[in-house]
Regions:
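Post-signal peptide N-terminal segment of mature Sec-exported envelope proteins
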Residues: 23-53
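Surface-exposed, polar/charged faces of alpha-helical domains
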Residues: 48, 52, 56-162, 166, ...
Length: 173
């Protein structure tokens, strides 16, 4: 009976980790949360690459890890948007619209160019430096999240990190 209760509780909690972001999330965060369909497709692709189905425990671990990684991704994106917006004086909605894809690396120069285009003027050297630093931090955070997630999933499923990394775009990472 205890085991059954544990499994049911685990399934309920795993479902929470893969549910789309609800109230209280910013627009950028909610659009970058892995949907249950994305997570299911990712799990199916993992199973296909591995050549066998994941166990229930592996499936739950993968779902939890992907949910946690997406939260980290959203935090990195929101930090980037907040730092850049505060530096150049643009509100969150404008900055968020310029950089909607949290899971994709940004070119530092392209970020500066987009902001300058939106403002209609050149950024000061200090603002350019701050935007480039925020962009580099965001890109490094994204890379670390991707690498860490791939290594964690790989170690739990017996797959190489490179194989898991190749599947990350299915999650928006």
């Amino acid at each position: 009976m205890r085991f059954l209760s544990f499994v049911v509780l685990t399934l309920v909690l795993a479902g929470c980790a893969t549910a789309p972001a609800g109230n209280g999330s910013s627009g950028a965060a909610s659009s970058n949360t892995a949907t249950p369909t994305q997570t299911q497709s990712f799990v199916a692709a993992l199973e296909a690459k591995r050549g066998s189905a994941l166990t229930l425990a592996e499936r739950l671990q993968v779902q939890g890890l992907t949910g946690t990684a997406k939260v980290g991704l959203n935090n990195a994106q929101n930090n980037f948007l907040n730092k850049v917006g505060a530096q150049v004086g643009l509100n969150g909605a404008v900055i968020s619209a310029m950089f909607p894809e949290a899971g994709k690396p940004l070119s530092e120069n392209a970020a500066v160019a987009k902001i300058e285009s939106s403002l209609g003027k050149k950024l000061t050297v200090a603002d350019q430096t701050a935007v480039k630093a925020a962009t580099a931090l965001r890109n490094n955070s994204l890379g670390n999240l991707r690498q860490g997630l791939a290594a964690s999933i790989g170690s739990r499923t017996g797959m190489s990190t490179d194989v898991v990394l190749a599947l990350m775009p299915m999650l928006g990472l």
